[in-house]
Amino acid sequence: MTLLRPTCIAVAMILAGCTAQAPSAETGAPAPAVADAPPATPAPTPSTLGTEPVLGPQPVAALGVGPDGSPLDPMDEAHAPVAAPDHKANDVATTTGADGVLRAQVLLLRQHFSTGEIDGKAGMNVAKAVRAFQKSHGLTVSGELDDATWAALNQDSAPVLMTYTLTQKDIDGPYAPTPERAEDKAKMDRIVYQTMLEMLGERYNAKPELLQSLNPDADFSKAGATLVVPYTRPAQSLPKAGRIVVDKSDGALQLLDADGKLFAQFPASTGSSKFPLPIGEWKLTSVVQDPDYRYNPDILVGQPKDAKPATLPPGPNGPVGIVWMGINKQHYGIHGTPEPGHISRTQSSGCVRLTNFAAQAVATAVEVGTPVTFQE
């Protein structure tokens, strides 16, 4: 299926969460919200520019995203791995301390069991990724990095840290501060990353502070500078998912195959007491890359009294990030975020929120009609 990047797909966070809709072909204005949930397999609606919503899987992104939030070319030779020299995390014997955690985080991610932003720190997201990996590989499920788990992870022999040379494109961006008010966001062409360091963090699914600690003497403002970064290319592409399962208590999104076997997991933010996750059985109705966002202050909490409705442009720092996957319940879906460090640590407005890195990965494995289970 040919991938189209829609420029006018409006995504609204309405009442309990978010929804994706196509603009009116006659006026170019966002289509009004409807009372009923969208059909399970909606027909594509052309926008004023002749594009259509993306209703199928996206191509695999090799190492995350570029400066404008777009997927990097999987065949880009600039991202071929060259092991970072003399770093303990690249040593298979490293199993403890911060370097051991860093090694585990990268290896888990390459097996599609994400710990969220890679930061070299143990915590709840590491433990639940380890548990899921152990379950999927028939190991004793403990959440601990025991010898058997390390043996399974170390079947992947590629380096966990590689060198990367900054390009002029990396330096040039575009980058821009993200305004606080929606009306100011609406004036932007794209809601891009604020800094190159933020972009690099999302490209390699790493906390920006980790990149700084790995490169204490690097000049991040100079094209040609060599950096040490996590090598996050998956060992294998994700297969087609038979089902998405979002577990509220575990704060995770899982992908299962047609036989119900777990093969991937990503941390997720899954609603709040005010806007709870809609427990039940659903299905995907859309998979939209680069969605716009419809802002309606009348139905959102804590908005300025003088705020007005606005359609915000797409971009990685938009409210729903770079991917929207809608379900057949009005206003609800699975999407990215401008704040990857908050995933699984803060609540959402009813939708399922992933890092942009994770949302893009999930979108490669699903399609319209994929069953979705939201469970306690």
Task: Name each model feature, range by range.
Residues 96-142:
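A short amphipathic alpha-helical interaction element
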Residues 237-337:
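Gly/Pro-biased beta-strand-loop elements
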Residues 24-78:
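Post-signal peptide N-terminal segment of mature Sec-exported envelope proteins
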Residues 305-376:
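Exported/periplasmic cell-wall-interacting domains
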Residues 15-17:
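C-terminal motif of bacterial Sec signal peptides marking the signal peptidase cleavage site
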Residues 104-108, 119, 129-134, 196-203, ...:
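Short alpha-helical segments in extracytoplasmic peptidoglycan/chitin-binding modules
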Residues 19-22:
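Bacterial signal peptide processing site
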Residues 124-128, 132-170, 212-239, 243:
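Extracellular LysM carbohydrate-binding repeats and other cell-envelope/extracellular binding modules
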